[in-house]
Amino acid sequence: MTPRRMLAGATSLFLATVVTWFAGLRVNLSGSMPIGLYRVRSGPPVKGAMVLACLPADVAVFARSRGYVPNGRCPGSTAPIGKVVLAMAGDSVEVTAEGLLLNGRPVRNTRPLALDAGGRSLRRFPDGTYIVAQDEVWLYSPYSTRSFDSRYFGPLHVSSIRSRVLPLWTVE
């Protein structure tokens, strides 16, 4: 391949990425949500919605050091995480060794793991029952038991949610 063709290919890829970004489209390649193309939506979070959220700086630094999240523009220089809103203001979340309970009902696929995929120990959020505050949300992934979510870091402030996302095309 000639240098000119390589430059043309790289330029085309760059322009496609920029156009996609400004069109409000995002590609998800993580296991926390189905792989695919998503449209960014504004508006407040709602229970059950897919969202992009920034982790608190201390959690972000830990997650990045473990390779759970790529670099990005959130605190701790990480990319936002894609998750589903599990609980909102007034909900009761119980954290146990067997998993999360939402308003007294077990939530599937939320048993916390003792070790991550690299065999390193994972510390879960302390066991107990938590009433979600007005300015908090709990996030999880119904798609992956290995997801790094609120089982490990607890609730997030609602301001950490950057956007809602709607799937346009996914591979499950």
Positions of predicted regions on the chain:
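Extended hydrophobic leader/signal-anchor segments used for secretion and membrane insertion
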Residues: M1-E172
